[in-house]
């Protein structure tokens, strides 16, 4: 089961990639921007603008050609409480406890000094310890991957995009009565005769959401009092898959979270839009709004438990100072990023830098923080390679508090 949990988010990312979709800790994955603290509203390139800010699509230079991103993928996992190992351990302890009960006879069970009775006592104590250690513990992950084709034009630039973002969270409800019953068996093994393991009430929860977008972006640049202002919009079809995995903690298997038994899906329409303006040769400011139409989608009801996933507008402002050698950028969310109603909201700010010492090499770093303090703050870094300025390979990694780590990669080509 440990293997299932450790690769749960990675499996989601792979499935998204196979479906030609994309996504991230934001509502997008783009390796260059992710390496720069998740920024990009003002600093993104025209070829990746459709993933970040559709207005950037209109900022192509005269000699820029068609750009194809195939693919962009990334994943992030946070497990500050080491929950994956604790859940694996409790699975082993449950099996051990049940095994000791199955293999003991009545005479040995009633004799507290027998070896078999002591085994029951020890197994009950181990299980109670594990339950106690699970109280209030959570683990979460985010992932994405996808494609985009951007076609610049002096009149109207166009891009085609398929992107998605995925998030998953594992948590538990530990019933104190379960611990008390197991402590009783630990003290008096014969008490197991009147305690049915199947009647224990503690539960494990797995919530997961995958939101995929399929859209066509259009963008155009205007001259307003000598200031180049770009405007972009992305109408998109939006599909959502929600998973509500609710089971007894003693039967919890994180590999089952994405089973169709716990899945609900929904299809709707949404819009992204953005602005970008250049001030002089070195300054760009941007504003983007993702998912401008709010949507609340209920999960399937499982074991009497239902949750609601919230898709709501996320408005982000950004600024960038750039030269041929150096780019400095900062982004800040003006609205909260919502998810399941059972979870806390986040609101991100990020700063980043890129140094381009050679025409084919870029080195990047950044920092991203949640001002609501509900998600991990992370340091980011990455490199970009562009041999012959035709094939672009971007790699990024992140590490932060609460045992948070992640990685991403992107391959793009220009023609």
PLM features: residue spans?
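Gram-negative bacterial Sec-dependent N-terminal signal peptides
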Residues: 1-23
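Subset of outer-membrane beta-barrel
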Residues: 25-415
């Amino acid at each position: 089961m440990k293997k299932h949990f450790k690769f749960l988010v990675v499996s989601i990312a792979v499935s998204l990639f196979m479906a030609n979709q994309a996504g991230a800790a934001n509502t997008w994955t783009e390796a260059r921007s992710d390496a720069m603290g998740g920024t990009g509203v003002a600093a993104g390139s025209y070829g990746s603008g459709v993933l970040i800010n559709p207005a950037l699509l209109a900022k192509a230079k005269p000699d820029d050609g068609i750009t194809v991103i195939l693919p962009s993928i990334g994943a992030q996992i946070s497990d500050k409480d080491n929950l994956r190992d604790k859940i694996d351990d409790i699975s082993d302890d449950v099996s051990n406890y049940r095994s000791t009960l199955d293999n003991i006879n009545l005479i040995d069970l009633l004799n507290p000094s027998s070896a078999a009775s002591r085994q029951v006592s020890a197994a009950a104590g181990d299980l109670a310890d594990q339950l106690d250690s699970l109280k209030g513990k959570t683990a979460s992950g985010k992932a994405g991957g996808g494609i985009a084709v951007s076609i610049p034009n002096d009149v109207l630039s166009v891009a085609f995009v398929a992107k998605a973002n995925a998030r998953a969270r594992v948590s538990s409800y530990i019933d104190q009565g379960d611990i008390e019953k197991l402590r009783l068996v630990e003290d008096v093994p014969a008490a197991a005769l009147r305690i049915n393991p199947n009647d224990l009430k503690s539960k494990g929860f797995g919530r997961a959401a995958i939101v995929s977008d399929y859209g066509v972006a259009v963008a155009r640049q205007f001259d307003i009092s000598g200031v180049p202002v770009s405007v972009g919009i992305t109408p998109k079809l939006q599909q959502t898959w929600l998973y509500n995995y609710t089971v007894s903690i003693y039967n919890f298997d994180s590999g089952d979270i994405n089973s169709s038994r716990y899945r609900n899906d929904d299809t709707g329409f949404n819009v992204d839009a953005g602005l970008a303006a250049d001030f002089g040769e070195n300054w760009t400011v941007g504003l983007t709004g993702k998912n401008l139409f709010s949507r609340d989608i209920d999960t399937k009801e499982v074991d009497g438990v239902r949750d609601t996933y919230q898709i709501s507008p996320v408005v982000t402002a950004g600024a960038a100072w750039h030269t041929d050698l150096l780019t400095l950028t900062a982004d800040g969310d003006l609205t909260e990023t919502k998810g399941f109603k059972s979870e806390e909201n986040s609101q991100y700010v990020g700063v980043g830098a890129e140094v381009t010492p050679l025409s084919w090499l870029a080195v990047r770093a950044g920092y991203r923080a949640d001002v609501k303090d509900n998600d991990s703050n992370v340091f980011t870094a990455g490199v970009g390679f562009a041999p012959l300025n035709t094939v672009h390979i971007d790699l990024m990694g992140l590490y932060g508090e609460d045992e948070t780590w992640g990685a991403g990669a992107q391959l793009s080509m220009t023609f």
